[in-house]
Each structure stands twice: as C-alpha cells, then as structure tokens.
C-alpha cells in the first residue's frame, strides 16, 4: 500500500474563511500560530466544523484491495476515481499460469492477508480469472470473477471535516485491518502543519 499526497489547501485559506465571518483579517499571521489556533478553536473546540471543509486534500492511493475499496466508498463526502479493471485485465491475461507456490508473482495483483488459506484461495481465483480471459471472454464480463483481494488504485479527494470522520472511524480496532492501515498511512501522508487537526482512534 502506498499513499501519496498530491495536493492540499493551505491553512491560510481556512483561516481566511473563518475570519470572513468576523471580518478580522488584520489579525491573521499568514498561517502562523494565531491562524492555527483559530482553526482548531473554531473548527474543533467550538464545533463549527463546516469551516474545516475549506481544507481539501487529494491523495493517490495504490495497492489496496477491492474489499478495502468497498469500505472506502462508504465515505460518501469524498470524490474517487478508480483504476478501471475493465481496461487493465490485459496485464493479467499476459501472465503465465499461477501455481500454489507463485505468491511472490501474484502479489503484483493480490493483497496478502495473514491467512494462508485465504491467500491460497485468492491465488486460485486469480488463476481461474486468467483462464476465463484466455477463453476470449470480454474484460467487461470477466471482471465478475475478480477476487476481493485484487489490487486497485485511485485518486481520492476529501475535505478535512470528512477526513476527521474517516480517520476516527477507520483507525478503530473494529474496522477492517486493511482500512486501519490505510487510515494510519493517510494520516502520515498529511502535511506536518495540518496533522494537529486530526486524531487517530486510540483504540486502534
């Protein structure tokens, strides 16, 4: 799993939006300590969380499973553009047969779990899918055979308010292990000067 922060909004934009309400622009210190404290006080402590929506982050997420993608898609206040399996299954079609000991080669396509039985089942499903592709069945139809562990990637854009909600819920120990890992990796990818606005679930 790899997460790359592609773009983010400056804290000065959020501070400016908050100061618009009181027309207190002269008190700004250009995104310094005063503005940082203002954002935290108004957006977090005073619960005017809509002001945090002016902060927007775009991430490029690679190497998560389709199972994790389904969990991610439940967070609807975000925009996601996902790698199309319909157009990329030709990569798999060109592979040699996957046998039981071929996990290292299969990891290009599959997310590895802690369960050997699950990994073996995923490997068999991957080979079954490859065989279906070799029959000349269209990618549009063959993708119905994709295992949930099949890797994908996406560009994901989310505002700070929605990201706070995501990180709190998905860093919990009750969340899927893979999305817990994603939550932690997203938090680490945030700009250092923004991280004070976000907390991971301590139970995670």
Curated annotation (Swiss-Prot):
Keywords: FAD, Flavoprotein, Methyltransferase, NADP, Nucleotide biosynthesis, Transferase. It comes from Wolinella succinogenes (strain ATCC 29543 / DSM 1740 / CCUG 13145 / JCM 31913 / LMG 7466 / NCTC 11488 / FDC 602W). The keyword Ubl conjugation does not apply. The lineage of its organism: Bacteria, Pseudomonadati, Campylobacterota, Epsilonproteobacteria, Campylobacterales. Catalyzes the reductive methylation of 2'-deoxyuridine-5'-monophosphate (dUMP) to 2'-deoxythymidine-5'-monophosphate (dTMP) while utilizing 5,10-methylenetetrahydrofolate (mTHF) as the methyl donor, and NADPH and FADH(2) as the reductant. The keyword Coiled coil does not apply. Belongs to the thymidylate synthase ThyX family. Residues 1-204 form the ThyX domain. This is Flavin-dependent thymidylate synthase. A motif (ThyX motif) lies at residues 74-84. The gene is thyX. Homotetramer. DUMP binds at residues 71-74, 84-86, 143, 170. FAD binds at residues 50, 74-76, 159-161, 165. The active site is at residue 170. GO terms for molecular function: flavin adenine dinucleotide binding; NADPH binding; thymidylate synthase (FAD) activity; thymidylate synthase activity.
């Amino acid at each position: 799993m790899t997460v790359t922060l592609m773009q983010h909004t400056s804290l000065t934009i959020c501070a400016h939006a908050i100061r618009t309400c009181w027309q207190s622009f002269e008190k700004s210190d250009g995104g310094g300590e005063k503005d940082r404290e203002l954002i935290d006080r108004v957006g977090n402590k005073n619960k005017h969380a809509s002001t945090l929506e002016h902060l927007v982050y775009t991430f490029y997420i690679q190497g998560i499973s389709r199972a994790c993608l389904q969990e991610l898609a439940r967070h609807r206040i975000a925009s996601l553009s996902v790698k199309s399996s319909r157009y990329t299954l030709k990569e798999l079609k060109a592979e040699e047969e996957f046998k039981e000991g071929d996990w290292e080669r299969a990891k290009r396509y599959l997310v590895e779990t802690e369960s050997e039985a699950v990994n073996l089942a995923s490997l068999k499903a991957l080979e079954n899918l490859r065989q279906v592709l070799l029959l000349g069945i269209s990618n549009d139809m063959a993708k119905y055979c994709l295992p949930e562990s099949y890797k994908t990637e996406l560009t994901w854009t989310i505002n700070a308010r929605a990201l706070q909600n995501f990180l709190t819920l998905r860093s919990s120990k009750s969340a899927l292990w893979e999305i817990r890992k994603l939550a932690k990796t997203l938090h680490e990818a945030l700009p250092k000067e923004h991280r004070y606005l976000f907390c991971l679930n301590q139970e995670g």
